[in-house]
């Protein structure tokens, strides 16, 4: 087995020291992929065909984190929660490298560009594109089918059918990629 491609399955995902079993309510679907170095801490749900990539950290300390079916959290992302602010990703969501999500909700088939930040109480609709490097401030609502970017992010226009299809392609690509990594680990 190639150590650089070694992933962590639901069976061997380690509980970090000091995380406390009283909040360890992890539910990891057998088809979910967790790459080596990723940390899944406390109250986190990984649904069917979801994936969490290298060195990402998901900390469901005070509330739950849900990674929806077919969604992917790419390398070096941080997902956290706040009091009464769970983080919920719908189906087919792509979270780009180095992104920080904190107590927010993201709708189905949405792309969050690399190095973006989404804060407590923010709600991103379905079929959205959040441009790389964007900041979605506390409590901001981005409606379905929107393209938004900037610091702070502003809605620029509606997404095109081609962009919606691209979001689906990205999510499907990571489902296939995770399957290849999982197979390489056998």
Predicted regions and their residues:
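Methionine residue identity
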Residues: 1-4
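Generic preference for hydrophobic/aromatic residues in regular secondary structure cores
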Residues: 6, 25, 56-58
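Short, low-complexity, charge-dense intrinsically disordered segments
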Residues: 7-17
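Exposed boundary/loop context
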Residues: 11-13, 53, 143
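Glycine-rich hexapeptide-repeat left-handed beta-helix
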Residues: 18-28, 61-69, 75-77, 81-82, ...
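N-terminal segments that cap or nucleate solenoid repeat domains
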Residues: 22-52
């Amino acid at each position: 087995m190639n150590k650089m491609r070694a992933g962590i399955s639901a069976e061997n995902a380690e509980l970090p020291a000091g995380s406390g079993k009283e909040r360890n309510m992890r539910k990891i679907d057998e088809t979910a992929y967790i790459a080596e170095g990723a940390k899944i801490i406390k109250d986190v749900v990984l649904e069917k065909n979801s994936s969490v990539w290298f060195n990402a950290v998901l900390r469901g300390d005070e509330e739950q984190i849900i990674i929806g079916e077919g969604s992917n959290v790419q390398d070096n992302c941080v997902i956290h929660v706040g009091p009464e602010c769970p983080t919920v990703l719908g189906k087919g969501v792509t979270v780009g490298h180095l992104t920080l999500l904190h107590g927010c909700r993201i709708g189905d088939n949405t792309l969050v560009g690399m190095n973006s930040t989404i804060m407590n109480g923010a709600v991103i609709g379905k079929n959205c594109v959040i441009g790389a490097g964007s900041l979605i401030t506390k409590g901001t609502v981005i409606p379905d089918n929107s393209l938004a970017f900037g610091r702070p992010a502003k809605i620029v226009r509606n997404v095109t059918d081609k962009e919606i299809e691209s979001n689906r392609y990205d999510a499907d690509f990571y489902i296939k990629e995770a399957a290849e990594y999982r197979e390489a680990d056998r």
